[in-house]
Design a protein with these regions (language model features):
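Extended, solvent-exposed segments with strong compositional bias
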Residues: 40-44, 107-151, 246-266
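Alpha-helical transmembrane segments forming the membrane-embedded cores
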Residues: 200-204, 240, 247-282
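Bacterial Sec-dependent N-terminal signal peptides
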Residues: 1-23
């Protein structure tokens, strides 16, 4: 297992040298919003634990201050999901230093134990506040070396917690080199081990997630919560034209196992959520593990690029 993790980190450094940090979720993912519900919400609204954890990677060569910007951080107004009346709060907290990203509790599917590991660098709680509705809020500045030094760069952890209330907070994020503008940091990226996001409302729309398959992985298990029978799950890769599985029902988990071929090693998968109904406000939670049960990160910018199926053309030889 250590060999798998070490090789994955090495390939991340090789493949990502020219990446530029993008919005989280990124344009490639075609996800309208990330979401976190407050702790008194019903789970059938689409959040299994009311906490989300995201990681932002800053290259070691970056010497200028960095910022984590959040779009629409309040919980009320234009985009957020109300239950009767808005009465909720959401807390955004940034952590750096030793253990922020490497502590095993920070990488669990369910946030328990010391998932707030590291040093808290910033924290802000939002309620129903028009001053932050449909606007960007900036956390920072942070010196890059305040993150935890990992092989792929300095890593900052952002924890979003649903506090009191029963409403859903929909938001986006950006790792930026400027406080008042979304300017990409060359070589930056972002990832999470569990994705909680809003599906698009339109029938036929497709959302994408991109886990990286490192050497040594023989199978992946894709776990989906509360897809509401809203469509199908399709897996595309350099070797898979589109393996289709059924979606999960309301407020339940569904696990699908997919074998990994040699051609798929050291590439990203394209996990597609294909919407087949014109239904609104469908929020989904997803995580993926390898054959050892280890969580695999989803990268905002797919490692090695968006995977494309490679058609194999057979040649018939006449004797």
């Amino acid at each position: 297992m250590k060999k798998i993790i070490t090789l994955a980190i090495f390939l991340l450094k090789v493949c990502c040298g020219n990446l530029q940090a993008q919005p989280f979720p990124s344009a490639d993912e075609k996800i309208p919003f990330l979401c976190t519900f407050s702790k008194n919400s019903q789970k059938d609204w689409g959040d299994d634990d009311f906490v989300q954890i995201y990681f932002f990677v800053v290259p070691q060569t970056e010497k200028n201050p960095i910022y984590i910007r959040v779009f629409d951080p309040d919980i009320g107004g234009k985009y957020d999901e109300v239950h009767d009346v808005f009465n909720s709060k959401t807390r955004f907290s940034v952590y750096g230093g030793k253990g922020a990203a490497s502590n095993p509790d920070a990488k669990k599917q369910t946030p328990t134990g010391n998932f707030k590991s590291g040093i808290q660098l910033s924290s802000k709680t939002f309620g129903d506040d028009a001053a932050y509705d449909d606007k960007w809020y900036t956390l920072g500045p942070f010196n890059p070396v305040e993150g935890e030094l990992q092989p792929d760069g300095y890593v900052f952890k952002l924890i979003i917690e649903g506090m009191d209330g029963d409403d859903g907070n929909l938001y986006k994020m950006f790792l930026s080199s400027l406080p008042n503008e979304n300017k990409a940091i060359e070589g930056g990226n972002a990832y999470t081990y569990e994705y909680s996001f809003r599906m698009a409302d339109t029938k036929g729309s497709i959302s994408h997630l991109y886990p990286f398959v490192s050497a040594g992985i023989t199978a992946v298990k894709i776990n989906v919560f509360d897809f509401d029978d809203d469509g199908i799950l399709r897996v595309v890769s350099v070797a898979k034209k589109g393996e289709i599985t059924k979606s999960s029902g309301n407020a339940v988990w569904l696990e699908n196992t997919h074998k990994i071929t040699t051609e798929e090693l050291n590439t990203s998968l394209d996990i597609q959520f294909v919407k087949q109904q014109d239904s609104k406000n469908n929020n989904v939670v997803v995580y993926i593990t390898n054959q050892y049960g280890e969580l695999m990160p989803f990268y905002a910018t797919p490692i090695g690029g968006v995977p494309k199926y490679k058609f194999k053309i057979g040649v018939k030889v006449d004797n």
